[in-house]
């Protein structure tokens, strides 16, 4: 008898699905270091007013914790619709919005509805690492088309890939993670027009970093492509609500009807809904940090370029830079300097989040000591 019941067996001993054997789970290191720049969070903490509002809002719902929450999160979705209408300039209503526990749950629900066994999803790589993981988890066949040498998306090449593969789901990340480039509305139209040539097929435009982007939101295209386009977003990045775990999508009302078929009952807790609504009431204050982060991004980009690094131009709150002979070894050197950044698996490149000015200074000081490749 060991101290941990059941520790005599391993994952290999379980009747796991064959298609999951050999897979690796998602994981960004969570280490205690002086400077953490690896998960693209907004480094500015919530204001005292926001903290007080969240605390009061949670206190108000605490008396009803013995009851299930609003299973459709109507009040939260209404607030999100109002925020999106103001932020993007495209009027949307509660009927256009769906919310869940982070945008990853949104993506999972979309793959449950539109992917699954016998269906496929196409991604343009390198891009967000959870897209293939969620595809695998929903038994959706994962297909890839490569981005260019600068990691940008060539719309003509991407449209050709859509026509060739006729996927059931297409992922387009804008701004792209980990490279940072946005996709223009004209290029998105080209991809959507290619998708319209086939029966079925849905394009998911992942706008997790949309508040940082210089390009208009794809939400403005939903009216023209109601059966083809879904836009996903999150409160974890610019909104500085990563600990709150709220993501959402914007689409034609019929897509929300599809989500109702696959969501788990009462999936968003009363506490989550109350806290998120409080955060939305302070959107102007929170998003005031976006301009500061963009200015810091440009400062860090210029400094790294001046040191001799190759910096991929970014439209988000992070920078992909290189070119290193051994990216994993260089990542360790940064960690030894007390700076945690991200090895995203692209040979020769590392990604850093834009942090507070003093955190960025620490990154630049470490970069100067490490030296450009």
Swiss-Prot record:
Cystine residue pairs: none
Transmembrane residue ranges: none
GO biological process terms held by the UniProt record: L-histidine biosynthetic process
Protein's pathway: Amino-acid biosynthesis; L-histidine biosynthesis; L-histidine from 5-phospho-alpha-D-ribose 1-diphosphate: step 7/9
Keyword line: Amino-acid biosynthesis, Aminotransferase, Histidine biosynthesis, Pyridoxal phosphate, Transferase
Region (Disordered): 1-45
Enzymatic reactions: L-histidinol phosphate + 2-oxoglutarate = 3-(imidazol-4-yl)-2-oxopropyl phosphate + L-glutamate
Gene3D superfamilies, alphabetized: Aspartate Aminotransferase, domain 1, Type I PLP-dependent aspartate aminotransferase-like (Major domain)
GO molecular function: histidinol-phosphate transaminase activity; pyridoxal phosphate binding
Domain of life: Bacteria
Its EC number(s): 2.6.1.9
PROSITE patterns hit by this protein: AA_TRANSFER_CLASS_2
Keyword presence, Transcription regulation: no
Cofactor: pyridoxal 5'-phosphate
Subunit and partners: Homodimer.
Similarity comment: Belongs to the class-II pyridoxal-phosphate-dependent aminotransferase family. Histidinol-phosphate aminotransferase subfamily.
NCBIfam families noted in UniProt: hisC (TIGR01141), PRK03317.1 (NF002877)
Name used for this protein in its record: Histidinol-phosphate aminotransferase
Organism: Mycolicibacterium vanbaalenii (strain DSM 7251 / JCM 13017 / BCRC 16820 / KCTC 9966 / NRRL B-24157 / PYR-1)
């Amino acid at each position: 008898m060991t101290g941990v019941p059941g520790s005599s067996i391993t994952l290999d001993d379980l009747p796991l699905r064959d298609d999951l054997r050999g897979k690796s789970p998602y994981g960004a290191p969570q280490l205690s270091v002086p400077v953490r720049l690896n998960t693209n969070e907004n480094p500015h903490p919530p204001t005292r007013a926001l903290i007080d509002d969240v605390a009061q809002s949670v206190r108000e719902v605490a008396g009803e914790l013995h009851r299930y929450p609003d299973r459709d999160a109507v009040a939260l979705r209404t607030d999100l619709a109002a925020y999106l209408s103001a932020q993007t300039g495209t009027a949307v209503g509660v009927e256009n919005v769906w919310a869940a526990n982070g945008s990853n749950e949104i993506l999972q629900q979309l793959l449950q509805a539109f992917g699954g066994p016998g269906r496929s999803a196409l991604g343009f790589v390198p891009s967000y690492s959870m897209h293939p993981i969620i595809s695998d988890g929903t038994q959706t066949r994962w297909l890839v088309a490569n981005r260019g040498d600068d990691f940008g998306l060539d719309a003509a090449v991407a449209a050709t890939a859509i026509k060739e593969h006729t996927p059931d789901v297409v992922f387009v990340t804008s701004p792209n993670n980990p490279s940072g480039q946005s996709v223009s509305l004209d290029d998105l139209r080209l991809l959507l027009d290619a998708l319209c040539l086939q029966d079925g097929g849905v394009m998911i435009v992942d706008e997790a970093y949309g508040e940082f982007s210089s390009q208009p939101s794809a939400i403005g295209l939903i009216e023209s492509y109601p059966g083809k386009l879904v836009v996903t977003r999150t409160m974890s990045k610019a909104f500085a609500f990563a600990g709150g775990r709220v993501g959402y999508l914007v689409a034609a009302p019929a897509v929300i009807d599809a989500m109702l078929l696959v969501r788990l009952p009462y999936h968003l807790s009363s506490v989550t809904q109350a806290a998120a609504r409080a955060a939305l009431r302070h959107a102007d204050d929170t998003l005031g940090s976006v301009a500061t982060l963009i200015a810091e991004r440009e400062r860090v980009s210029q400094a790294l370029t001046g040191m001799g690094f190759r910096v991929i131009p970014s439209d988000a709150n992070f920078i992909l830079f290189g070119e290193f002979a051994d990216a994993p070894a260089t990542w360790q050197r940064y960690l030894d300097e007390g700076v945690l950044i991200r090895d995203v698996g692209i040979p020769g490149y590392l990604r850093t989040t834009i942090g507070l000015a003093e955190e960025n200074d620490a990154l630049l000081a470490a970069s100067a000591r490490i030296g450009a490749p």
